[in-house]
């Protein structure tokens, strides 16, 4: 905590680039947001449409996907960046073929200095690798939202 600016500066000094400085740089739709739309058959497409209708004009739209079915929804939602989360290199390669230049592709999640070459060979536009900015082991923390169960009265 409190070191974000220094971490981003260190990436630049090391020859990397920071494509996002803060949450205000674009709309990022992640899995926890989609829980709120799980009643629809196309939650990613629905989220993209809602975000586009409410975001400032020209704001970048980024959506995190975990499967090829979700990639198809993101393509239909005409987002700017599709973030392939925790995909292996073979699935990432398939996803990149589906996207065919209709959005920038970023691979993220599970990328290490040991597997980054295999992921780069899949052909993404960007690779997000947290190993560049964290060296000390940290506790894994997450917030998981689950839909509220409706009573069957």
Name what the model sees in each region.
Residues 1-66, 70-77, 81, 90-98, ...:
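Acidic/glycine-rich phosphate/pyrophosphate-binding loops and surrounding catalytic core
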């Amino acid at each position: 905590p409190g070191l974000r600016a220094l971490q981003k500066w260190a990436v630049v000094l090391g020859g990397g680039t920071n494509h996002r400085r803060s949450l205000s740089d674009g709309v990022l739709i992640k899995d926890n947001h989609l829980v709120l739309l799980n009643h629809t058959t196309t939650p990613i497409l629905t989220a993209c449409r809602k975000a586009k209708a409410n975001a400032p004009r020209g704001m970048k739209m980024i959506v995190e996907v975990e499967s090829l079915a979700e990639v198809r929804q993101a393509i239909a939602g005409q987002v700017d960046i599709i973030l392939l989360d925790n995909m292996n290199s073979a699935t990432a390669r398939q996803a990149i073929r589906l996207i065919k230049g209709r959005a920038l592709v970023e691979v993220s999640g599970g990328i290490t200095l040991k597997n980054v070459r295999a992921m780069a060979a899949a052909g993404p536009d960007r690779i997000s690798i947290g190993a560049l900015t964290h060296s000390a082991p940290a506790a894994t923390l997450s917030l998981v939202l689950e839909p509220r169960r409706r009573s069957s009265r």
